[in-house]
Amino acid sequence: MTKKQAIKRKVKEPEPTNEQSSASEPSDNEEDDDLLQAVKDPGEDTTDDEGIDQEYQSDSSEDLEFESDEEGNYLGRKANNEAEGDAEEDEDDDEEEDEDSDEASEDNDDAEEEKPSSSMTAAVQTKVEPIIQIIPRDPSKPEYEDSDTSDEEDIRNTVGNIPMHWYDEYKHIGYDWDAKKIVKPPKGDQIDDFLRKIEDPNFWRTVKDPQTGQEVLLTDEDIALIKRVNSGRIPNAEHDEYAPWIEWFTSEVEKMPIKNVPDHKRSFLPSVSEKKKVSRMVHALKMGWMKTTEEVEREKQKKRGPKFYMLWETDTGRESMRRIHDPVSAPKRDLPGHAESYNPPPEYLFDEKETKEWLKQKDEPHKRKLHFMPQKFKSLREVPAYSRYLRERFLRCLDLYLCPRAKRVKLNIDAEYLIPKLPSPRDLQPFPTVESLVYRGHTDLVRSVSVEPKGEYMASGSDDKTVKIWEIATGRCIRTIETNDVVRCVAWCPNAKLSIIAVATGSRLLLINPKVGDKLLIKKTDDLLAASPSLDVIDNERIKTAVQWSNAEPEEQEKGVRVVITHFKPIRQVTWHGRGDYLATVMPEGANRSALIHQLSKRRSQIPFSKSKGLIQCVLFHPVKPCFFVATQHNIRIYDLVKQELIKKLLTNSKWISGMSIHPKGDNLLVSTYDKKMLWFDLDLSTKPYQTMRLHRNAVRSVAFHLRYPLFASGSDDQAVIVSHGMVYNDLLQNPLIVPLKKLQTHEKRDEFGVLDVSWHPVQPWVFSTGADCTIRLYT
């Protein structure tokens, strides 16, 4: 039997008492006794001086064998010689260890309880490695019960960490692991909560789970944990916060040298190599080969030269430095022209009109085209001395030494670069391009035209004192209504439920039922206009003297005239409100009563302004807001009819305003002037024109926006109707797009008049124009 088998059997057998062990198992030889002293008793403490359990194992997977030398010291070495012989024995030993592992563990525990005495040192013992016992996990308990991980939480609601108030409007509160809705539990009212407070003894420890909405009963451990947290103590009651401190690592810094080798004896003797080096340097100094530091500095100073320097780079540039840098020569005077000759051609001499204009600008000489008046002499000897010679020489000297001179780089900018890039007109269709119909029947100037809201009929007014109703599709004149004066303006009511035409003729405003279209609509209009006015409204004297309401005479009733509103001055313009109940008239000669607002349903009139801010040309209602636009000769004022105050004043910078039209959205205004301009105002942007368009050669008399398409048209005395694209975007950061599309010029000019009015079809992209040639033209 080998030594290892004997040691293992010693471990397996129960350990006897001290007396029995010493008597029954005497040591066989001295080697076994020394082996017991070398091997540490497994019953002793296996911790090091720091308190950490130490597990003694072999240096490698092979076994260690202990031998003793002559002095009794035991050495461990690998059993290389007996590796083959012990291989079979090791296999048997492993089988025996597996069978008797339980008995060995019990014997090991007994050995720890009873330490061997001195008599037991003779017994052969062996070092037994500690056996690690794996305790199986209880499946009924969570794997991470005592840890902080959240992977094993009992999560019923799988919505995640989101605000649960997102589910307040739903009947469910989330989804379970089967993707089914978790229905909210029924909620009680305040009475149920009050009864639970009284009857339920566990009400105070019941909380609501926000994930599932269920009520959870807190255990005693939960309540104790909450109390400890509220009191500021450690949540775990088993934790000892005053446990003795174990200093696993020392806090004392031990300063020890890296090497502690004593100095050599030759380190105390002077260096021989340094002695030779110094002797060579002394010899070089004596021979002049080596220079001292002072000599080196003196040589460097000689190489640097003197410290003073020249004020200028070169002697030749001294004079140029004294002068002005880059002098600019004085501009030369303009050479005399033909007008300054003593005998100029006749076309350069002033006539009486030019002479008066030149003398009129005496106080503003800078506005004169020439600073002198050309004169003609027969011969050079007749030319007198120049009277302005000294003054011009003096002004020239002032310009030379008082006016600063500078060189300006001339920018060569291509003209095409300044022109904005506009889309092609082909991409902006549809818009009218050709003349389709010509409506003939009037015998004098056709001043105004208006289209029915449905787009089937059209009304026109002329200087021949007639109003004509036209069928648009066929060009046939359905009815002609004669008036007693020149028709300045006609306006069809924009309300499609009424069939009314407002005609301004002289100082009378006629409300006419044209009797075209639906018969029920015609009857409804007659019933509305035949209703007697209310008597509870009392007009003041100022209104009574300005306007009077009356029913039409029987002769006019047959023509279709229903109501006559008589004004105290000639009417120039009439316009409707978008709902068709209010209409406004303009009398330029009416001073502070130039503009009047009439209400059709109550048959009453109002004077909105008590003072005249200028000669009113035209008025306009806002399509959406309760605002009123009033255009004078130079400016446009916007009033709030509800608050009765001025909102904004638009500056046109023009001589005379002829008309205006507002965009259907109400944010942009188009103004026409007699000085050949069209002004586009962005009401949200500024009080000054956003864009000024000079498309016509003569006065622009009328402008109009289309109700549906991004189109607007203008008519001028140059017999042209110009159709343009005007897109207004909902994005406030994007400017309107204005593109001229087509110039339609088919009217004839008579008495310096051309196109007098333009109007759009309410549905189709068609435009109507009236002219001085007594015609109405349709462009499609």
Curated annotation (Swiss-Prot):
Q: What is its main location?
A: nucleus
Which Gene Ontology BP annotations are present?
Answer: maturation of 5.8S rRNA from tricistronic rRNA transcript (SSU-rRNA, 5.8S rRNA, LSU-rRNA); maturation of LSU-rRNA from tricistronic rRNA transcript (SSU-rRNA, 5.8S rRNA, LSU-rRNA); regulation of hemocyte proliferation
| Annotated region (Disordered), positions in chain | 1-155
Q: Which Pfam families does this chain map to? A: BOP1NT (PF08145), WD40 (PF00400)
A GO cellular component annotation in the UniProt record = nucleoplasm
Compositional bias of kind Basic residues: 1-11
Compositional bias segments (type: Polar residues): 17-26
Instruction: Show the ranges annotated as biased composition (Acidic residues).
Output: 44-53, 60-72, 83-113, 145-154
Q: Which HAMAP family match?
A: BOP1
UniProt similarity note? Belongs to the WD repeat BOP1/ERB1 family.
Briefly state the protein's biological role: Required for maturation of ribosomal RNAs and formation of the large ribosomal subunit.
Q: Which protein, by its recorded name, is this?
A: Ribosome biogenesis protein BOP1 homolog
